[in-house]
Amino acid sequence: MMWGAGRSMAWFSAGSGSVNVSIDPAEEPTGPATLLPSPRAWDVVLCISGTLVSCENALVVAIIVGTPAFRAPMFLLVGSLAVADLLAGLGLVLHFAADFCIGSPEMSLVLVGVLATAFTASIGSLLAITVDRYLSLYNALTYYSETTVTRTYVMLALVWVGALGLGLVPVLAWNCRDGLTTCGVVYPLSKNHLVVLAIVFFMVFGIMLQLYAQICRIVCRHAQQIALQRHLLPASHYVATRKGIATLAVVLGAFAACWLPFTVYCLLGDANSPPLYTYLTLLPATYNSMINPVIYAFRNQDVQKVLWAICCCCSTSKIPFRSRSPSDV
Protein backbone atom coordinates (compact mmCIF):
# COMPACT_ATOMS: atom_id res chain seq x y z
CA MET A 1 0.00 0.00 0.00
CA MET A 2 1.34 3.37 -0.94
CA TRP A 3 1.15 5.89 1.82
CA GLY A 4 1.71 9.08 -0.12
CA ALA A 5 -0.51 11.48 -2.00
CA GLY A 6 -2.00 11.52 -5.43
CA ARG A 7 -3.82 8.81 -7.32
CA SER A 8 -1.56 6.01 -6.18
CA MET A 9 -1.80 7.08 -2.56
CA ALA A 10 -3.65 4.46 -0.60
CA TRP A 11 -3.54 4.79 3.16
CA PHE A 12 -0.64 6.68 4.59
CA SER A 13 0.31 10.28 4.27
CA ALA A 14 3.97 10.64 3.46
CA GLY A 15 6.60 13.26 3.71
CA SER A 16 8.81 14.95 6.21
CA GLY A 17 7.58 18.49 6.55
CA SER A 18 5.41 18.61 3.42
CA VAL A 19 2.80 16.51 1.70
CA ASN A 20 4.38 14.18 -0.81
CA VAL A 21 2.49 14.19 -4.09
CA SER A 22 4.05 11.35 -6.03
CA ILE A 23 1.78 11.53 -9.08
CA ASP A 24 -0.14 14.51 -10.38
CA PRO A 25 -3.63 13.31 -11.34
CA ALA A 26 -3.81 15.91 -14.13
CA GLU A 27 -0.63 14.62 -15.73
CA GLU A 28 -1.14 10.93 -15.02
CA PRO A 29 -1.27 8.76 -18.14
CA THR A 30 -4.50 6.93 -18.80
CA GLY A 31 -5.27 3.63 -20.44
CA PRO A 32 -3.41 0.32 -20.39
CA ALA A 33 -0.02 2.00 -20.21
CA THR A 34 -0.69 3.34 -16.69
CA LEU A 35 1.97 2.03 -14.35
CA LEU A 36 0.92 0.56 -11.04
CA PRO A 37 2.97 1.36 -7.92
CA SER A 38 5.29 -1.32 -6.60
CA PRO A 39 4.45 -2.72 -3.16
CA ARG A 40 6.84 -2.10 -0.31
CA ALA A 41 7.87 -4.70 2.23
CA TRP A 42 5.35 -3.50 4.81
CA ASP A 43 2.56 -3.58 2.22
CA VAL A 44 3.28 -7.27 1.71
CA VAL A 45 3.43 -7.84 5.48
CA LEU A 46 0.00 -6.24 5.92
CA CYS A 47 -1.39 -8.37 3.08
CA ILE A 48 0.01 -11.55 4.65
CA SER A 49 -1.41 -10.51 8.03
CA GLY A 50 -4.79 -9.96 6.39
CA THR A 51 -4.65 -13.43 4.86
CA LEU A 52 -3.91 -15.07 8.23
CA VAL A 53 -6.63 -13.03 9.93
CA SER A 54 -9.14 -14.06 7.25
CA CYS A 55 -8.32 -17.77 7.52
CA GLU A 56 -8.51 -17.84 11.32
CA ASN A 57 -11.78 -15.98 11.60
CA ALA A 58 -13.37 -17.78 8.65
CA LEU A 59 -12.79 -21.00 10.59
CA VAL A 60 -14.47 -19.54 13.69
CA VAL A 61 -17.45 -18.30 11.66
CA ALA A 62 -17.80 -21.70 9.96
CA ILE A 63 -17.72 -23.51 13.31
CA ILE A 64 -20.34 -21.27 14.91
CA VAL A 65 -22.64 -21.27 11.86
CA GLY A 66 -22.26 -25.01 11.29
CA THR A 67 -22.84 -26.07 14.90
CA PRO A 68 -26.48 -25.78 16.06
CA ALA A 69 -25.38 -25.97 19.71
CA PHE A 70 -23.59 -22.65 19.32
CA ARG A 71 -26.69 -20.46 19.37
CA ALA A 72 -26.27 -19.10 22.88
CA PRO A 73 -25.83 -15.33 23.31
CA MET A 74 -22.15 -15.70 24.15
CA PHE A 75 -21.48 -17.44 20.82
CA LEU A 76 -23.49 -14.81 18.94
CA LEU A 77 -21.13 -12.19 20.34
CA VAL A 78 -18.05 -14.25 19.51
CA GLY A 79 -19.48 -14.78 16.04
CA SER A 80 -19.94 -11.03 15.61
CA LEU A 81 -16.30 -10.52 16.61
CA ALA A 82 -15.17 -13.18 14.13
CA VAL A 83 -17.24 -11.66 11.30
CA ALA A 84 -15.78 -8.22 11.99
CA ASP A 85 -12.22 -9.55 12.06
CA LEU A 86 -12.86 -11.64 8.93
CA LEU A 87 -14.07 -8.49 7.18
CA ALA A 88 -10.95 -6.66 8.35
CA GLY A 89 -8.67 -9.38 7.02
CA LEU A 90 -10.42 -9.48 3.66
CA GLY A 91 -10.28 -5.69 3.53
CA LEU A 92 -6.51 -5.71 3.97
CA VAL A 93 -6.05 -8.27 1.19
CA LEU A 94 -8.45 -6.54 -1.21
CA HIS A 95 -6.92 -3.15 -0.46
CA PHE A 96 -3.54 -4.53 -1.46
CA ALA A 97 -5.08 -5.81 -4.70
CA ALA A 98 -6.83 -2.49 -5.38
CA ASP A 99 -3.58 -0.55 -5.02
CA PHE A 100 -1.05 -2.80 -6.70
CA CYS A 101 -3.02 -5.10 -9.01
CA ILE A 102 -6.03 -3.08 -10.16
CA GLY A 103 -4.99 0.49 -9.49
CA SER A 104 -8.49 1.72 -8.66
CA PRO A 105 -8.62 4.75 -6.30
CA GLU A 106 -12.41 4.44 -6.04
CA MET A 107 -12.18 0.82 -4.93
CA SER A 108 -9.39 1.78 -2.53
CA LEU A 109 -11.61 4.46 -0.95
CA VAL A 110 -14.47 2.00 -0.48
CA LEU A 111 -12.13 -0.55 1.09
CA VAL A 112 -10.78 2.02 3.55
CA GLY A 113 -14.40 2.52 4.61
CA VAL A 114 -14.82 -1.25 4.90
CA LEU A 115 -11.72 -1.46 7.10
CA ALA A 116 -12.91 1.39 9.30
CA THR A 117 -16.25 -0.40 9.69
CA ALA A 118 -14.63 -3.77 10.39
CA PHE A 119 -12.15 -2.56 12.99
CA THR A 120 -14.82 -0.45 14.72
CA ALA A 121 -17.19 -3.45 14.79
CA SER A 122 -14.38 -5.62 16.16
CA ILE A 123 -13.72 -3.21 19.03
CA GLY A 124 -17.46 -2.83 19.63
CA SER A 125 -17.91 -6.61 19.72
CA LEU A 126 -15.14 -6.87 22.30
CA LEU A 127 -17.00 -4.33 24.43
CA ALA A 128 -20.24 -6.31 24.01
CA ILE A 129 -18.47 -9.51 25.11
CA THR A 130 -17.11 -7.70 28.17
CA VAL A 131 -20.58 -6.39 29.06
CA ASP A 132 -22.00 -9.91 28.65
CA ARG A 133 -19.32 -11.37 30.90
CA TYR A 134 -20.02 -8.80 33.57
CA LEU A 135 -23.80 -9.30 33.47
CA SER A 136 -23.41 -13.09 33.57
CA LEU A 137 -21.64 -12.72 36.92
CA TYR A 138 -23.60 -9.78 38.31
CA ASN A 139 -27.00 -11.28 37.38
CA ALA A 140 -26.06 -14.95 37.47
CA LEU A 141 -29.54 -16.16 38.49
CA THR A 142 -31.39 -14.37 35.69
CA TYR A 143 -28.74 -14.51 32.97
CA TYR A 144 -30.20 -17.52 31.13
CA SER A 145 -33.47 -15.92 30.08
CA GLU A 146 -35.16 -14.48 27.03
CA THR A 147 -34.14 -11.01 28.19
CA THR A 148 -30.50 -11.97 27.69
CA VAL A 149 -31.12 -13.00 24.08
CA THR A 150 -32.96 -9.75 23.35
CA ARG A 151 -30.21 -7.72 25.00
CA THR A 152 -27.60 -9.52 22.92
CA TYR A 153 -29.35 -8.68 19.66
CA VAL A 154 -29.75 -5.06 20.75
CA MET A 155 -26.04 -4.80 21.57
CA LEU A 156 -25.07 -6.34 18.23
CA ALA A 157 -27.40 -3.98 16.36
CA LEU A 158 -25.90 -0.95 18.12
CA VAL A 159 -22.36 -2.16 17.43
CA TRP A 160 -22.87 -2.71 13.71
CA VAL A 161 -25.01 0.37 13.09
CA GLY A 162 -22.39 2.52 14.81
CA ALA A 163 -19.57 0.81 12.92
CA LEU A 164 -21.34 1.26 9.58
CA GLY A 165 -21.91 4.92 10.35
CA LEU A 166 -18.24 5.56 11.12
CA GLY A 167 -17.14 3.50 8.11
CA LEU A 168 -19.45 5.12 5.57
CA VAL A 169 -18.51 8.67 6.54
CA PRO A 170 -15.21 8.76 4.57
CA VAL A 171 -16.78 6.98 1.60
CA LEU A 172 -19.73 9.34 1.26
CA ALA A 173 -18.30 12.71 2.26
CA TRP A 174 -15.83 13.20 5.08
CA ASN A 175 -12.45 12.48 3.49
CA CYS A 176 -9.40 14.46 2.41
CA ARG A 177 -9.12 13.47 -1.25
CA ASP A 178 -9.75 17.07 -2.32
CA GLY A 179 -7.71 18.70 0.44
CA LEU A 180 -4.54 16.86 1.38
CA THR A 181 -3.68 19.38 4.10
CA THR A 182 -6.63 18.09 6.16
CA CYS A 183 -5.42 14.48 6.02
CA GLY A 184 -4.44 12.47 9.04
CA VAL A 185 -1.94 9.63 9.14
CA VAL A 186 -4.27 7.32 7.18
CA TYR A 187 -5.28 8.50 3.72
CA PRO A 188 -8.02 9.35 2.79
CA LEU A 189 -9.30 9.71 6.36
CA SER A 190 -9.27 13.28 7.59
CA LYS A 191 -7.53 14.26 10.79
CA ASN A 192 -10.85 15.11 12.44
CA HIS A 193 -12.34 11.73 11.52
CA LEU A 194 -9.33 9.94 13.01
CA VAL A 195 -9.73 12.00 16.18
CA VAL A 196 -13.36 10.87 16.42
CA LEU A 197 -12.31 7.23 15.96
CA ALA A 198 -9.61 7.65 18.63
CA ILE A 199 -12.11 9.13 21.08
CA VAL A 200 -14.47 6.20 20.46
CA PHE A 201 -11.62 3.78 21.16
CA PHE A 202 -10.65 5.47 24.43
CA MET A 203 -14.29 5.46 25.54
CA VAL A 204 -14.58 1.74 24.78
CA PHE A 205 -11.25 1.00 26.48
CA GLY A 206 -12.26 2.97 29.58
CA ILE A 207 -15.58 1.11 29.86
CA MET A 208 -13.85 -2.25 29.39
CA LEU A 209 -11.27 -1.36 32.04
CA GLN A 210 -14.00 -0.46 34.52
CA LEU A 211 -16.03 -3.60 33.75
CA TYR A 212 -13.03 -5.89 34.12
CA ALA A 213 -12.24 -4.25 37.46
CA GLN A 214 -15.81 -4.99 38.58
CA ILE A 215 -15.49 -8.57 37.28
CA CYS A 216 -12.33 -9.05 39.36
CA ARG A 217 -14.13 -7.83 42.49
CA ILE A 218 -17.07 -10.17 41.87
CA VAL A 219 -14.78 -13.13 41.21
CA CYS A 220 -12.80 -12.49 44.40
CA ARG A 221 -15.98 -12.19 46.45
CA HIS A 222 -17.46 -15.39 44.99
CA ALA A 223 -14.20 -17.27 45.55
CA GLN A 224 -14.16 -16.27 49.21
CA GLN A 225 -17.79 -17.34 49.67
CA ILE A 226 -17.15 -20.71 48.02
CA ALA A 227 -14.05 -21.27 50.13
CA LEU A 228 -16.01 -20.58 53.33
CA GLN A 229 -18.90 -22.85 52.32
CA ARG A 230 -16.64 -25.76 51.35
CA HIS A 231 -14.15 -25.18 54.18
CA LEU A 232 -11.28 -24.86 51.73
CA LEU A 233 -7.87 -23.57 52.67
CA PRO A 234 -7.41 -19.87 51.86
CA ALA A 235 -4.41 -20.64 49.67
CA SER A 236 -6.41 -22.90 47.34
CA HIS A 237 -9.04 -20.35 46.38
CA TYR A 238 -6.38 -17.63 46.30
CA VAL A 239 -4.45 -19.52 43.60
CA ALA A 240 -7.57 -20.07 41.49
CA THR A 241 -8.64 -16.44 41.85
CA ARG A 242 -5.19 -15.16 40.98
CA LYS A 243 -5.17 -17.34 37.86
CA GLY A 244 -8.54 -15.95 36.75
CA ILE A 245 -7.47 -12.35 37.34
CA ALA A 246 -4.22 -12.97 35.47
CA THR A 247 -6.23 -14.25 32.49
CA LEU A 248 -8.38 -11.11 32.50
CA ALA A 249 -5.25 -8.96 32.71
CA VAL A 250 -3.76 -10.75 29.69
CA VAL A 251 -6.97 -10.25 27.69
CA LEU A 252 -7.17 -6.53 28.45
CA GLY A 253 -3.41 -6.06 28.13
CA ALA A 254 -3.35 -7.66 24.68
CA PHE A 255 -6.15 -5.38 23.53
CA ALA A 256 -4.37 -2.29 24.84
CA ALA A 257 -0.97 -3.29 23.44
CA CYS A 258 -2.45 -3.83 19.98
CA TRP A 259 -4.55 -0.70 19.68
CA LEU A 260 -3.07 2.00 21.92
CA PRO A 261 0.01 2.77 19.74
CA PHE A 262 -2.04 3.35 16.60
CA THR A 263 -4.75 5.31 18.41
CA VAL A 264 -2.26 7.64 20.09
CA TYR A 265 -0.42 8.12 16.80
CA CYS A 266 -3.70 9.06 15.09
CA LEU A 267 -4.03 11.89 17.61
CA LEU A 268 -0.42 13.07 17.44
CA GLY A 269 0.39 12.50 13.75
CA ASP A 270 -0.70 14.41 10.67
CA ALA A 271 -0.30 14.36 6.88
CA ASN A 272 3.41 15.18 7.18
CA SER A 273 4.23 12.31 9.54
CA PRO A 274 6.57 9.59 8.20
CA PRO A 275 4.50 6.75 6.70
CA LEU A 276 6.73 4.13 8.33
CA TYR A 277 5.39 5.14 11.75
CA THR A 278 1.84 4.47 10.58
CA TYR A 279 2.81 1.00 9.38
CA LEU A 280 4.59 0.24 12.65
CA THR A 281 1.53 1.23 14.71
CA LEU A 282 -1.13 -0.21 12.38
CA LEU A 283 0.46 -3.66 12.18
CA PRO A 284 -0.08 -4.44 15.91
CA ALA A 285 -3.72 -3.37 15.48
CA THR A 286 -4.15 -6.06 12.81
CA TYR A 287 -2.58 -8.57 15.20
CA ASN A 288 -5.50 -7.98 17.56
CA SER A 289 -7.78 -9.50 14.93
CA MET A 290 -5.32 -12.39 14.72
CA ILE A 291 -5.30 -13.20 18.44
CA ASN A 292 -9.03 -12.65 19.05
CA PRO A 293 -9.96 -16.14 17.74
CA VAL A 294 -7.41 -17.68 20.11
CA ILE A 295 -8.64 -15.75 23.15
CA TYR A 296 -12.39 -15.86 22.58
CA ALA A 297 -13.00 -19.02 20.51
CA PHE A 298 -10.22 -21.61 20.41
CA ARG A 299 -9.80 -21.57 24.22
CA ASN A 300 -13.39 -22.74 24.63
CA GLN A 301 -13.58 -26.49 25.27
CA ASP A 302 -16.69 -26.98 23.13
CA VAL A 303 -15.02 -25.23 20.19
CA GLN A 304 -11.98 -27.44 20.70
CA LYS A 305 -14.20 -30.54 20.50
CA VAL A 306 -15.61 -29.36 17.18
CA LEU A 307 -12.12 -28.65 15.87
CA TRP A 308 -10.96 -32.14 16.81
CA ALA A 309 -14.04 -33.65 15.17
CA ILE A 310 -13.33 -31.71 11.97
CA CYS A 311 -9.69 -32.80 11.97
CA CYS A 312 -10.76 -36.43 12.45
CA CYS A 313 -13.48 -36.13 9.77
CA CYS A 314 -16.12 -37.01 12.36
CA SER A 315 -19.66 -35.73 12.72
CA THR A 316 -20.20 -32.93 15.21
CA SER A 317 -23.85 -33.84 15.88
CA LYS A 318 -22.94 -36.41 18.55
CA ILE A 319 -20.48 -34.23 20.44
CA PRO A 320 -21.57 -33.75 24.08
CA PHE A 321 -21.61 -30.03 24.79
CA ARG A 322 -21.87 -28.63 28.26
CA SER A 323 -23.44 -25.38 29.29
CA ARG A 324 -20.74 -22.80 29.83
CA SER A 325 -20.82 -19.24 31.00
CA PRO A 326 -19.53 -16.30 28.99
CA SER A 327 -16.57 -16.03 31.34
CA ASP A 328 -15.34 -19.31 29.88
CA VAL A 329 -15.27 -17.88 26.38
UniProtKB/Swiss-Prot annotation:
Chief location category: membrane
Positions in the Extracellular compartment: 1-43, 95-108, 175-192, 269-277
Stretches assigned to the Cytoplasmic side: 65-73, 130-153, 214-247, 299-329
Annotated GO CC locations: cytoplasm; nuclear membrane; plasma membrane
Gene3D superfamilies given in the database record: Rhodopsin 7-helix transmembrane proteins (1.20.1070.10)
Phosphoserine PTM positions: 323, 325, 327
Positions annotated as glycosylated: 20
Localization per Swiss-Prot or TrEMBL: Cell membrane
A GO BP entry: G protein-coupled receptor signaling pathway coupled to cGMP nucleotide second messenger
Matching Pfam families: 7tm_1 (PF00001)
The keyword Glycoprotein appears for this protein: yes
Tissues of expression: Abundantly expressed in granule neurons at all development stages. Enriched in the longest tips of neurites during differentiation of hippocampal neurons.
Protein topology in the membrane: Multi-pass membrane protein
Its biological purpose: Constitutively active G-protein coupled receptor that maintains high 3'-5'-cyclic adenosine monophosphate (cAMP) levels that a plays a role in serveral processes including meiotic arrest in oocytes or neuronal development via activation of numerous intracellular signaling pathways. Acts as an essential activator of thermogenic adipocytes and drives thermogenesis via its intrinsic G(s)-coupling activity without the requirement of a ligand. Has a potential role in modulating a number of brain functions, including behavioral responses to stress, amyloid-beta peptide generation in neurons.
Name used for this protein in its record: G-protein coupled receptor 3
Annotated source species: Rattus norvegicus (Rat)
